[in-house]
């Protein structure tokens, strides 16, 4: 028989940098989960990722205080800022241009994010990436 799920917890944790300090410690601790077990497992799975890359993680909490977690791909904004070589998006998207990304970079980001996006084709994924870029004030060239 399957374990009874009592809840889900969504966090964004830097790759290889999970530790019991806030925000991870309090979020897991108040639900009675083993904080160090999560930190060790997460850090082991993210050691091949670039350090401090934000990794969204969904933790499934069970009634017996055990858990499983699923890692997603880093946020699209992280990839776009990296591709455009900017620290943050525009304060006035649509008016001010914060940077530029090429179609090749958009395709590369779409291919990396494909498993987390709700679309079937790479072209649809590219349109989602382009929309996110425009909402950040980035110009899509090419």
From Swiss-Prot:
BP terms from Gene Ontology: translation
Modified how: One or more lysine residues are methylated.
Molecular function (Gene Ontology), one example: structural constituent of ribosome
Pfam families tied to this protein: Ribosomal_L11, Ribosomal_L11_N
Keywords from the named record: Methylation, Ribonucleoprotein, Ribosomal protein, RNA-binding, rRNA-binding
SMART domains the record matches: RL11
A cellular component term, taken from the record's GO annotations: cytosolic large ribosomal subunit
NCBIfam families registered for this protein in UniProt: L11_bact (TIGR01632)
Self-association state and partner proteins as the record states: Part of the ribosomal stalk of the 50S ribosomal subunit. Interacts with L10 and the large rRNA to form the base of the stalk. L10 forms an elongated spine to which L12 dimers bind in a sequential fashion forming a multimeric L10(L12)X complex.
Family affiliation: Belongs to the universal ribosomal protein uL11 family.
PANTHER family xrefs: 60S RIBOSOMAL PROTEIN L12 (PTHR11661), LARGE RIBOSOMAL SUBUNIT PROTEIN UL11M (PTHR11661:SF1)
Stated role: Forms part of the ribosomal stalk which helps the ribosome interact with GTP-bound translation factors.
Name of the molecule in the record: Large ribosomal subunit protein uL11
Gene: rplK
